[in-house]
């Protein structure tokens, strides 16, 4: 397992805490990707969550792939298109095959328990 860079250590001895900075939503848009890339390049971010189903996922990956970071899956069921066949998850997608928004999902859960 990759050792993450500690950005800040707070407290002393047994009561100390370490802060590791993580960025989420890599792949959401080119603007988000570039912001995360800048933070990774400057050493502020050492852990990144990637939205693999989003249109700009490949762009984001190409920006950060050569850095020594922890790159993880950001599970996403409320934006973009699913990686699986939308017909298999009809309660999660709209007619156009894209995921329902979090607001729509919340409404559906409220109505259907």
Could you say what each language-model-derived stretch is?
Residues 82-113:
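Active-site gating loops and adjacent loop-to-helix segments of metal-dependent hydrolytic enzymes
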Residues 3-16:
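Short, Lys/Arg-enriched N-terminal segments with co-localized hydrophobic residues
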Residues 18-20, 45-49, 68-74:
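Structural preference for beta-strand elements that scaffold enzyme active sites
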Residues 18-29, 108-113:
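Active-site mouth loops of central-metabolism enzymes
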Residues 24-26, 51-53, 74-78, 105:
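Active-site beta-loop-alpha junctions enriched in small/polar residues
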Residues 30-55:
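A short alpha/beta connector and helix-capping loop motif
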Residues 70-77, 96, 100-102:
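Non-cysteine beta-strand/loop elements that form the S-adenosyl-L-methionine
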Residues 36-42, 58-70, 87-97:
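Acidic (Asp/Glu)-rich catalytic clusters
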């Amino acid at each position: 397992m990759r050792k993450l860079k500690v950005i800040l250590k707070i407290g002393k001895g047994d009561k100390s805490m370490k802060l590791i900075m993580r960025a989420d939503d890599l792949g959401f848009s080119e603007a988000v990707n570039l912001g995360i890339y800048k933070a990774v390049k400057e050493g502020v971010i050492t852990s990144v969550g990637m939205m693999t189903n989003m249109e700009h996922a490949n762009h984001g990956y190409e920006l950060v792939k050569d850095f020594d970071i922890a790159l993880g899956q950001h599970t996403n069921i409320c934006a973009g298109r699913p990686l699986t066949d939308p017909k298999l998850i009809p309660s999660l997608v709209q007619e156009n095959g894209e995921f329902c928004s979090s607001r729509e999902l919340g409404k559906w859960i409220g109505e259907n328990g």
